[in-house]
Swiss-Prot record:
Signal sequence, start to end: none
GO MF annotation list: calcium-dependent phospholipid binding
Naturally occurring in which organism (per UniProt): Plasmodium falciparum (isolate 3D7)
Alphabetical list of InterPro entries matching this protein: C2_dom, C2_domain_sf, CEP76, CEP76_C, CEPT76/DRC7_peptidase-like_dom
Subcellular location: Membrane
Compositionally biased residues, Basic and acidic residues: 17-26, 1193-1211, 1230-1243, 1456-1474, 1481-1629, 1652-1663, 1670-1692
Chain spans, region Disordered: 16-36, 1193-1244, 1346-1370, 1456-1635, 1652-1692, 1827-1846
Alphabetically ordered keywords of this record: Calcium, Calcium/phospholipid-binding, Coiled coil, Exocytosis, Membrane
Origin organism lineage: Eukaryota, Sar, Alveolata, Apicomplexa, Aconoidasida
Protein name as it appears in the record: C2 domain-containing protein
Disruption phenotype: Conditional knockdown results in decreased invasion efficiency due to incomplete microneme discharge.
Domain (C2): residue spans on this chain: 497-623
């Protein structure tokens, strides 16, 4: 090979030849290129030069090292065998190299050829063997290519090398990283060795991922510097040959027409050309009148009235009464507008009636016509050679219009990704019941571009060829455009895809297919709004639902593209290739795009097909001959076609008068105009109009509909009467908008149903996807269509709402775009979705705000919710159900007369406005929208005829008295745009790189910001903490993208994560967490946002520590969802702890005051109406009707407290309307009285039985509490009667009829049994009412089962005897108790006053304590301050001495430098003088020699004069040469002097730098000394604090002892009381036994003695146990005391504060809540974390913080310990399944992202280990936040202190 001539070269130090070569090269660059070289280098010199260039950068080894390198094993990647095979399996790659150009940068011409080494790992190495250097090569080459020689490549000339090669490369994915493409450019020499001019190397992976078009510059080393030699331009197609498996799933067809139907319909045009039938539609899809416009009678009114009541509608509550008090005037205005609307609608009956105006026929008009038997065939077209004829044929289905094939099958396709993108699917639908000639009923072609990333397919079927011919022959071709032959929907899923993708398009033509070819030349000047100086640009051409791009031109504003684009033309048949069909495909759009940090739209133009073939004078253009060369076969094809060459001005989005022209040419392959038959009839197309693509009937009446629309707005008075343009109004009533191409479009044409590429079923995920598109502020009133916003990657709120609505329609969902105004009167748009709640049976409206991410929910906003339910079911129903429903309607409907329909519509309009419901819904969330003006979807526009506020209207858009439709018929409109395929997600390597840069830049910017404020930043980069934070970000992303069913689970996961974070917080620290979400990855924008919003970044606390987590998700369309989580941890100071204590104490006081006030109010209310027992008995208190009053319980209340509060507020506002509702409410109460009484009786009986079952009797029973409860019951019974009047005033949100539907209704048998039980237990109830507190009786009630039957009988007898005697006494006692109520209340008041006094005394005592402590602290601080001041003075003096000494040294150094400068300058002057003298002497010598010669020559003869003159001329020449040499010497001397000057200046600069560095060091020393002083201060303060803490701890321990002793005493008292009770029980039992069975006294005494002995033994055992417990507690206390001295100061502080904070009530709760530290699934659903997604909390701010309690571990007197709890937690962790454990299992090895389209793989910007959840839980997450005191630093600090003291 090439290196054979270098075998014997040993040294590489021969640099003389290289220098000479460099000098010659420099001379050659300066000379002209045409002149020949004076001296050509020898062969040896050329060899050495090429060797130097080739071996530059080659690795150098010793011989042993080289042998080790050869023995290294082959690299492998992957943990499993499958992954190893994935990376190491050799694959096939298709390579095409063509369009190679070379450009010379040198001044000399040269003959060039190029070598390409594609692949292979051959590498030359320099090896030292002893004293010699040798070259060895390792590895092999795979593909070597060489171009032909190109002669005379001139300077700055771009010359084509006419080289093209196609081959296959074989290598694995690892080989792409290791192997390279090596390019060598050689200069061809005819008689000597060829000369190497430059080498270029690049790994193959960069070409497999990069652009197809490549430009590279090659450099040459001349005089140890790199110089540009030449530039290569080439196109390299490098893609993997892959076996794709196309699986066709869920393919469905809708609205198919049978062949017999098509023939009958075409025959109908011939038979009835003039009499075309119109029919009335009653289908819910396009019917405004829901009940066939029938007459309404009185019973219909009653039904409407009942519906109104069922939906909480108040008839007398009108349109405007809810908003102001002047309801009468507003009513009159409202009535006027309603009358005017009625008149207007009657006048325009032809526009309002619901008649189908399309001339289609349905199955109901035809007889003996069957439904189709469809069969589908799918074939691939435009495929590479060898793939023609690949097809799938489905199974035939019989008599169905909506067929579905869940799995059509698979097609196996071998090729590259580009081959797949270029190919098309030809779909043919056949009716197998028809003959062969007319079997085809629909065809279409679908492009497969982007099918790998976006698998959804949807298209409309076109007419078959036999039908088109028939229509042309019979003359009804225009009517064929209105036909709807059906639609296709389906999925083409490709499970496995190549790993790498190449960017860019190829110009390729298949000779069998027609193409539109566009040649883009250049653009004069690119103009932008911001006047960007450099921009990367490309041109995109789109036509016939396909688009192609040119190559990218970098960093130029006048790009020269010179690239051709080929767009395949879709024709169903070869006979259809003509101008007529080409012109139907629309305009050709050429757009120019730019790439910088953001994507920029520069401008665009549009061209009609007519302009290609005809000039401005409507004359056909001439044909020209063109050539095409096939890439793979290299075969030339010549053809004749019409070429249009032109230049057009770009149309900008902004208003700009500057010129920017694009030069291009367009033609077709083959010539399409030659195939057209009717060339004479071709007419120039009409300019663009909004009604261009409308149905014919809608286009005819469009102007009338616009006039009616304006008249409706004027009658509502939302627009002034003089207004002619809607754009000038303050409200948002636009029905047309201008798009990016400056074309006006009807609003419904700007929306269409699009299947979402990201989580197609989740509305939250789609909303999140749309919000990840950046927002752009637009000055011009222009809207972007959804495809344009996706391509531009930006838009305003209206553009986002259009895209969001179209994605919602693809789910499918009832979605609308809303136009309205904000509270600042700005026009705004948002999205609304209508849903039906099955559980609660009402309709819901959701407003999706794209700018803020909020979702507002309005409940109960539909009157006819059944209609809403039907519409929702119809959207979600399957195709088969829709087939059955549609077929039934079409077959069994009857024709109606048009005049009859007009009369019915008249009646219906009048009756609608008569029975118009004037009530409005009230309540709801606070909305940012002031008005809602209109809503629209992809079919129609609806104008709001109700109130302007979105809260106070009904959303039944099908009722035209609420919402006026723009058109009475919902037409199927074609959208004004075509959705291009969504681009693929960003590559993992790029995302990881972006995440790393973002992470580092954010940290860097925060550090710079804090450093600018003289603040240091400390980062905690603990890996376990970062993993934990990243898990939190993943959970937040799950919540934002979860389905409706999974929202609760996502919230539970976040709550679980928060608990784990709380548990790991270190003591005496405060933690704050701030999660953020951004739709960009610009580090500057994100860091500025963080700095501006986070005020804690400005804190000067030295203990502040930060931690950062970054998580990026790649979304379809090359969008990024960026999550950032910042945690700040700060140490809590004593002041903050005191403040927290004060705040807690204040809150407790306020709560106590409120409770006391409530008790006072309740006691005052009880004194109002106090009934005596006689009054109760006279009114039959114990009857079934009044039991609810006597035994009223809180659980039996009908209304909750919230509803009562709403009632009271509502009464005060709406007292005027109460009189009109009294009669209705009274009737309702009478009707439901019997039902209510039965319910109350059943509840009261259950309550009575609860006395028997529940534990009523406790150890102590207070009379006061029992009497108070009794008084409350009495008060409720008396207060209820007074509430009867108040009920008439109250207006509920729910109807009075359905109040009791949710409760269970008891049976009659249960009620009778309950009443019997009540009569048996009357005595017990009576005693309870009296408030008797005898313990024995309550024990009998509690435990009746312990007694025998005889004992019960005796008790009953005794009770009957005593009951008669006690009745009289009971009455008297009851009266006394009633009289004594006042006394008890007085005592209560006195007790409350005493309590308040005690509280005040406590507060004063605490304040005095605080004052004393503060005084002591102040004294200590003053002493410390004095000492510190003295130290500072001493240190300042030292610093001043040092500074003065340093200044003196600096002055001396300056003087020395000045002296040195003076000496050097003096020496230079002396040298200059010497040089001048030498020059003068040389000149004088020359003059003298010339004078002597002249004197000698004068004596010569005249004959010798001529010779002498010649000699003189020669001497003059020599003198001139000497002068030139001297001048050169002078120049060289000047250069040397200048170099010396430069060196001296550099020395001076270095000296200055050294001085500055010394100054900086001194300043640093000063700062360090200051820091040391501050640290000493802090230490002294810490010592003082520690002493205070010790004192406080001692106090707290003494208080603990006192509390423990008090508790022991209380326990002993309780035990004694229990013993007394037991003894009493025993005595009573003994008495009863004596009555029943007489026993001897001796036996009784013996029994008693035995009993007493047993009781004594038990008591002794219990006392021993108590003593042991006391001793154990004392031992624990001693041990704790010793351990507490060794613990950290922070823990002591927190524990002491914790004991002070916890009250007795909280101490009880510690026992109940001891499992707070557990990390399990027992979560409180009422405390779910909902701030992250911001879906439901709309009033709260966007900033979200996670606050962690400083004191997490509680100390209690209970027996449990934290150690036992941790053991239990471990056991539960092993046994039970936990949500958190399920979450934190990371599945990195599963390649889910390759096959699942909805899988999101997070990117963190940092490689993290796969840590298990157990390790995270067991590790200390926050160890980096605490500064651990190191033993090494302390002695250093002590030394510094000693030095300072000395």
């Amino acid at each position: 090979m090439i290196l054979d001539k270098f075998k014997n070269i040993v040294n590489l130090s021969n640099s003389n030849t290289e220098k000479e070569e460099g000098k010659n090269a420099e001379i050659n660059e300066n000379n002209d290129p045409n002149t020949q070289l004076a001296h050509e280098p020898s062969i040896v010199e050329a060899d050495e030069k090429t060797f130097f260039d080739e071996m530059l950068g080659a690795p150098q080894y010793t011989y042993d090292e080289f042998l080790q390198v050869l023995k290294n094993p082959i690299e492998e990647r992957g943990d499993t065998e499958d992954m190893k095979k994935h990376w190491g399996y050799p694959r096939r790659w298709k390579v095409i190299l063509w369009d190679l150009h070379i450009q010379n940068y040198m001044n000399n011409d040269f003959n060039a050829f190029v070598d390409f080494d594609f692949g292979g790992n051959r590498e030359e190495c320099r090896i030292q063997r002893g004293s010699t250097m040798k070259i060895y090569a390792k590895g092999k080459t795979k593909n070597c290519l060489r171009t032909p020689v190109v002669t005379n490549v001139a300077t700055e000339q771009k010359k084509n090398m006419n080289f093209r090669n196609v081959f296959e490369y074989r290598g694995s994915y690892l080989d792409l990283e290791n192997e390279k493409l090596r390019i060598r450019v050689w200069e061809y020499k005819q008689f000597t060795l060829n000369k190497l001019e430059g080498i270029y190397e690049e790994p193959l992976l960069s070409f497999a991922v990069g652009e197809i078009y490549n430009e590279t510059t090659l450099y040459k080393f001349i005089k140890d510097s790199r110089v540009k030699r030449c530039r290569l331009y080439f196109q390299l197609y490098f893609q993997e040959l892959y076996d794709f498996e196309l699986s066709f799933l869920n393919w469905s067809f809708s609205d198919l027409l049978s062949s017999s139907y098509i023939q009958a319909k075409s025959y109908n045009y011939l038979s009835n050309k003039n009499n075309v039938k119109k029919r009335y539609i009653d289908d819910t899809s396009c019917n405004i009148f829901p009940h066939m416009c029938k007459n309404f009678k009185r019973f219909h009114k009653k039904k409407i009235y009942r519906k109104v009541r069922n939906y909480d509608i108040d008839k007398n509550f009108s349109f405007n009464t809810a908003l102001s008090d002047d309801s009468d005037e507003r009513k009159n205005k409202n009535d006027r507008t309603i009358k005017n609307l009625e008149k207007l609608f009657v006048r325009n009956l032809t526009l309002m009636q619901n008649i189908e105006e399309n001339e289609d026929m349905s199955y109901k008009n035809l007889q003996n016509i069957n439904l189709p038997n469809p069969r589908v065939t799918i074939t691939l077209s435009h495929t590479p050679k060898g793939h023609e004829g690949l097809n799938i044929i489905s199974i035939e289905q019989k008599s169905i219009r909506f067929p579905i094939w869940e799995n059509l099958g698979e097609i196996y396709f071998r090729g590259t990704l580009r081959d797949l993108d270029v190919s098309y699917l030809n779909i043919k639908v056949e009716d197998m019941s028809a003959p062969k000639s007319a079997r085809e009923i629909g065809t279409c072609q679908i492009s497969l571009k982007g099918i790998v990333d976006y698998p959804y397919v949807m298209h409309e079927l076109e007419a078959p060829s036999w039908l088109v011919k028939e229509a042309k022959y019979e003359g009804w071709e225009n009517k064929l455009n209105e036909w709807k032959l059906g639609t296709v929907e389906g999925k083409v899923i490709i499970n496995r895809v190549p790993r790498y993708r190449q960017r860019g398009d190829i110009y390729h033509i298949d000779s069998k297919q027609p193409y539109l070819i566009v040649h883009i030349f250049n653009i004069d000047k690119i103009i932008t709004v911001d006047n960007i100086k450099e921009l990367d640009t490309y041109v995109e051409v789109s036509f016939d639902e396909t688009s192609r791009r040119t190559r990218l031109m970098k960093k130029t504003l006048s790009p020269n593209y010179d690239s051709q684009i080929s767009i395949p033309l879709r024709f169903n048949n070869k006979n259809d290739i003509n101008y007529e069909n080409l012109s139907k495909k629309g305009l050709i759009y050429i757009d120019v795009w730019g790439k910088s940090e953001d994507i920029v739209y520069i401008g665009g133009i549009s061209i009609s097909p007519y302009e290609i073939f005809f000039n401005e004078k409507n004359v056909r253009r001439n044909k020209t001959k063109l050539e095409h060369i096939d890439l793979e076969t290299n075969v030339k094809i010549t053809y004749d076609t019409v070429v249009y060459r032109g230049c057009k001005k770009l149309c900008f989005l902004h208003d700009d008068q500057r010129m920017s022209n694009i030069h291009f040419s367009i033609w077709t392959y083959p010539d399409i105009l030659g195939n057209s038959t009717n060339q004479k009839k071709i007419v120039a197309p009409v300019s663009f109009n909004t009604t261009m693509n409308f149905p014919i009937k809608l286009a005819e009446k469009y102007n009338k509909l616009k006039k009616l629309f304006m008249e409706v707005l004027k009658t509502i008075k939302s627009i002034p009467e003089n207004c002619t343009d809607v754009n000038t109004s303050t409200r948002f009533y636009n029905y047309e908008l201008i798009n990016q191409r400056k074309e006006k479009h009807f609003l419904p044409t700007l929306i269409t149903s699009i299947k979402s590429p990201y989580c197609a079923e989740s509305m939250n995920a789609i909303f999140h996807y749309v919000r990840c598109i950046p927002f752009i502020h637009k000055k011009e009133n222009i809207i972007f269509t959804p495809d344009f916003t996706l391509q531009l990657k930006g838009g305003n709120a209206l553009d986002h709402s259009l895209l969001l609505c179209s994605l919602f329609l693809g789910i499918p969902v009832l979605a609308f775009v809303c136009f309205g105004t904000l509270w600042d009167k700005q026009k705004h748009s948002w999205v609304a979705t209508f849903e039906y709640n099955d559980e609660k049976n009402y309709g819901i409206v959701k407003f999706w705000e794209t700018t803020t991410g909020n979702v507002y929910i309005l409940k109960k906003r539909f009157i006819d919710h059944n209609r809403l339910k039907g519409l929702e079911l119809k959207l979600k129903e399957s195709k088969y159900k829709s087939h059955l429903r549609n077929g039934f309607l079409q077959r069994y409907e009857n024709n109606t007369d048009i005049n009859y329909i007009k009369e019915q519509t008249k009646r219906h309009i009048k009756q609608l406005f008569k029975n118009r419901i004037n009530d409005i819904p009230i309540g709801g969330p606070s909305l940012p929208y002031k008005t809602i003006d209109l809503i629209f979807n992809h079919k129609n526009i609806y104008v709001n005829l109700q109130h302007s506020s979105p809260l106070n209207i009904w959303y039944d858009y099908w009722k035209f008295d609420f919402w006026f439709p723009f058109s009475s018929i919902e037409y199927n409109l074609q959208p004004s745009f075509t959705i291009k395929s969504f681009t693929h997600k960003m590559e993992d390597m790029e995302l990881d790189k972006i995440a790393k840069e973002l992470r580092t830049n954010i940290e860097k910017n925060i550090n710079i910001y804090r450093a600018s404020r003289n603040l240091s930043t400390r980062w905690n980069r603990d890996e376990t903490l970062e993993i934990f934070l990243q898990v939190g970000l993943e959970l937040l992303h799950q919540l934002n993208t979860s389905r409706k069913e999974d929202v609760l689970l996502a919230k539970l996961k976040i709550e679980d994560w928060k608990k784990a974070l709380y548990h790991k917080v270190p003591q005496s620290h405060r933690l704050l967490g701030f999660p953020y979400h951004f739709n960009t990855y610009k580090s500057k924008f994100i860091s500025d946002k963080l700095i501006s919003t986070l005020a804690i970044l400005e804190s000067r606390d030295r203990s502040l520590c930060l931690s950062l987590a970054v998580c990026l998700y790649s979304l379809p369309g090359n969008f990024i969802s960026c999550y950032i989580y910042i945690i700040t941890c700060v140490k809590i100071t004593q002041r903050e702890l005191r403040k927290m204590e004060i705040i807690k104490e204040k809150a407790q006081r306020m709560a106590e005051i409120k409770n006391s006030q409530k008790k006072k109010k309740s006691s005052d209310d009880q004194n109002i109406d106090i009934k005596t027992m006689d009054d109760v008995e006279e009114k039959e208190t114990f009857s079934s009707t009044n039991l609810d009053d006597t035994l009223h319980d809180e659980h039996t209340d009908i209304d909750t407290e919230k509803k009562k509060h709403e009632k009271d507020n509502y009464k005060n506002k709406k007292i005027k309307n109460t009189k009109l509702k009294d009669a209705n409410i009274d009737n309702e109460e009478k009707d439901d009285h019997h039902h209510i009484t039965d319910k109350k009786v059943s509840k009261s009986s259950d309550l009575i039985h609860s006395f028997d079952k529940n534990d009523i009797s406790k150890n102590t029973f207070d009379k006061e509490e029992f009497i108070n409860n009794l008084d409350k019951d009495k008060k409720y019974s008396s207060f209820k009667k007074g509430n009867v009047v108040n009920k008439k005033v109250s207006i509920k949100n729910e109807p009075s009829i359905n109040i009791y539907e949710d409760h269970k209704i008891y049976d009659d048998e249960n009620i009778s049994n309950n009443i019997d039980n009540m009569e048996n237990n009357q005595d017990e109830i009576y005693n309870l009412r009296q408030g008797k507190t005898i313990i024995n009786e309550f024990q009998q009630v509690k435990k009746p089962q312990k007694y025998t039957i005889n004992e019960k009988r005796d008790d009953i007898k005794t009770k009957k005897k005593r009951s008669k005697e006690k009745k009289k006494q009971d009455k008297l006692e009851f009266e006394k108790l009633i009289q004594s109520n006042a006394y008890f209340e007085q005592e209560k008041k006195k007790l409350q006053e005493d309590i308040k006094k005690l509280e005040k005394d406590k507060e004063q005592f605490q304040k005095e304590k605080i004052r004393r402590e503060e005084k002591e602290k102040q004294l200590l601080l003053e002493e410390k301050i004095k000492l510190q001041k003295e130290k500072e003075l001493f240190e300042n003096e030292k610093l001043e001495r040092k500074m003065s000494y340093m200044l003196k040294i600096n002055e001396l150094e300056k003087k020395k430098n000045e002296r040195n400068k003076m000496e050097k300058s003096y020496k230079r002057m002396i040298q200059k003088d010497k040089e001048k003298k030498k020059k003068k002497e040389s000149r004088d010598k020359i003059r003298r020699g010339e004078e002597e010669k002249m004197s000698a020559d004068e004596n010569m003869k005249e004959e010798q004069k001529m010779r002498e003159e010649q000699k003189v001329g020669e001497e003059q020449k020599v003198g001139e040469e000497q002068k030139v040499g001297e001048e050169q010497k002078l120049r060289e001397e000047q250069k040397m002097r200048e170099e010396q000057k430069m060196r001296e200046e550099q020395k001076m600069r270095e000296e200055q730098k050294m001085r500055e560095e010394q100054k900086v060091r001194e300043e640093q020393k000063m700062r360090e000394e200051q820091k040391m002083r501050e640290e000493q201060k802090m230490r002294e303060e810490q010592k003082v604090r520690e002493e205070q803490k010790l004192r406080e701890e001692q106090k707290m321990r003494e208080e603990q002892k006192m509390r423990e002793e008090q508790k022991m005493r209380e326990e002993e008292k309780i035990r004694e009381e229990e013993q007394m009770k037991r003894e009493k029980k025993m005595r009573r039992e003994e008495k009863k036994k004596r009555v029943q069975e007489p026993i001897k006294i001796d036996e009784i005494q013996v029994y008693d003695i035995i009993k007493n002995e047993k009781m004594k033994k038990k008591e002794e055992k219990e006392e021993k146990k108590r003593k042991k417990k006391k001793e154990d507690i004392e031992d624990k206390y001693k041990i704790g005391k010793e351990a507490s001295l060794d613990e950290n100061n922070n823990e002591r502080q927190i524990k002491s504060k914790n004991i002070q904070e916890i009250s007795d009530y909280e101490y009880k709760n510690i026992k109940e809540n001891k499992n707070l530290n557990k990390f399990d699934e027992k979560l409180d659903l009422n405390q779910i974390y909902s701030k992250a997604s911001n879906f439901y909390d709309n009033q709260e701010k966007k900033r979200r913080t996670i606050k962690v309690h400083a004191n997490r571990k509680e100390n209690s007197d209970s027996t449990f310990s934290h150690i036992d709890d941790s053991i239990k937690n471990k056991k539960e962790y092993l046994e039970d399944s936990n949500i958190a454990r399920y979450l934190y299992e990371k599945r990195k090895h599963d390649l889910i992202g390759k096959g699942n389209y909805n899988f999101d793989e997070p990117h963190y910007g940092k490689k993290m280990n796969n840590v298990a959840y157990q390790d995270i839980k067991g590790s200390n997450l926050f160890k980096g936040f605490i500064e651990e005191p190191s033993s090494k630093k302390s002695p250093q600090k002590k030394k510094i202190v000693i030095v300072r003291k000395n």
